Amino acid sequence: MKPQFRNTVERMYRDTFFYNFNNRPILSRRNTVWLCYEVKTRGPSMPTWDAKIFRGQVYSKAKYHPEMRFLHWFRKWRQLHRDQEYEVTWYVSWSPCTGCANSVATFLAEDPKVTLTIFVARLYYFWKPDYQEALRVLCQKRGSPHATMKIMNYNEFQHCWNKFVRGRREPFEPWENLPKHYTLLHATLGELLRHLMDPGTFTSNFYNKPWVSGQHETYLCYKVERLHNGTWVPLNQHRGFLRNQAPDIHGFPKGRHAELCFLDLIPFWKLDGQQYRVTCFTSWSPCFSCAQEMAKFISNNEHVSLCIFAARIYDDQGRCQEGLRTLHRDGAKIAMMNYSEFEYCWDTFVDRQGRPFQPWDGLDEHSQDLSGRLRAILQNQGN
């Protein structure tokens, strides 16, 4: 039976928004997909031409899904406006299913004058290979038109609140753990779409001169392997990179370090009781607090071994030294990155477009110097 929904609505109720757009990664009973859209003419001023809401049931026939309803409406309308270029933005409670993702990819290939940005509150069946592949096809960057997909953060939720929620008399108040859930989903989408780092970002952040100023971000690249018949087998579905979350009054008021964001992510993988090896490549070694939390993790998860390769040592005085020693004592392997680790990260995590890794002046000397300092820190058990 056809779902009893009007084609579009202009506003949703406050409780409807909070219930359906909650970004907790795993939620049950959210069977209605809400798609808020904006269509703008492409140009300097980019006025909004239309902004409404489609909705549909996830378990209904594909033609009743909101993505398909939007395409049906937009295709008919485009017949009268073939020459104009448009930028379309979606804010959806769930990412598209495989059928809708494939249909949207086909539409974009047929109409290159339309660009599409999709902000999603949650990822639908993100652990299933066919869903992962459909989203990769939809968002592939080379060879054909593609969509840009991002996870909704505070700004997008606030925008939807202001634009698509009726009767609002108060500002948007984020629910508990919104920023933490955003971080998890952002990293998961990066794994799924196989996001790569900009070459300049890698070079500037992983430059291993022992003393640098102005580097307040930490980047953490990671890979996971499982032991099988005595051989470590890469799990490429759990490979990616993330960075620390800057202080934000609407997100993490005190910020959140990259290592803690990474520890938030690991339980999301649902690793079983087999033996795993997790390897991190970080632009800075962990601070005292992060080292303590990582030590707790490996103590509580004896089937997971942890290897950390750092480009630089973060504040190698006082408590940071103590934190590194604790982490090392509890079983983590800690070392400084050398040429082979930098090259591996360049080849694996950077959008290098075929360019080989070019070491900067002093890379080997800096690595040797830092390795000596790290050995002294880890061996100085008396401090």
From Swiss-Prot:
Its main location: cytoplasm. GO terms for biological process: cytidine deamination; cytidine to uridine editing; defense response to virus; DNA cytosine deamination; innate immune response; negative regulation of single stranded viral RNA replication via double stranded DNA intermediate; transposable element silencing. The record marks 244 as: Interaction with DNA. PROSITE patterns: CYT_DCMP_DEAMINASES_1, CYT_DCMP_DEAMINASES_2. The keyword Transcription regulation does not apply. The modification Phosphothreonine is found at residues 32, 218. Zn(2+) 1 binds at residues 65, 97, 100. Gene3D superfamilies: Cytidine Deaminase, domain 2. It comes from the Eukaryota. Keywords: Antiviral defense, Cytoplasm, Hydrolase, Immunity, Innate immunity, Metal-binding, Nucleus, Phosphoprotein, Repeat, Zinc. GO terms for cellular component: cytoplasm; nucleus; P-body; ribonucleoprotein complex. Disulfide bonds: none annotated. Residues 213-215, 312-319 are annotated as: Interaction with DNA. It is an enzyme of class 3 (hydrolase). Its EC number is 3.5.4.38. The active site is at residue 259. It catalyses: a 2'-deoxycytidine in single-stranded DNA + H2O + H(+) = a 2'-deoxyuridine in single-stranded DNA + NH4(+). The CMP/dCMP deaminase domain 1 mediates RNA binding, RNA-dependent oligomerization and virion incorporation whereas the CMP/dCMP deaminase domain 2 confers deoxycytidine deaminase activity and substrate sequence specificity. Belongs to the cytidine and deoxycytidylate deaminase family. This is DNA dC->dU-editing enzyme APOBEC-3G. It comes from Papio anubis (Olive baboon). The lineage of its organism: Eukaryota, Metazoa, Chordata, Craniata, Vertebrata.
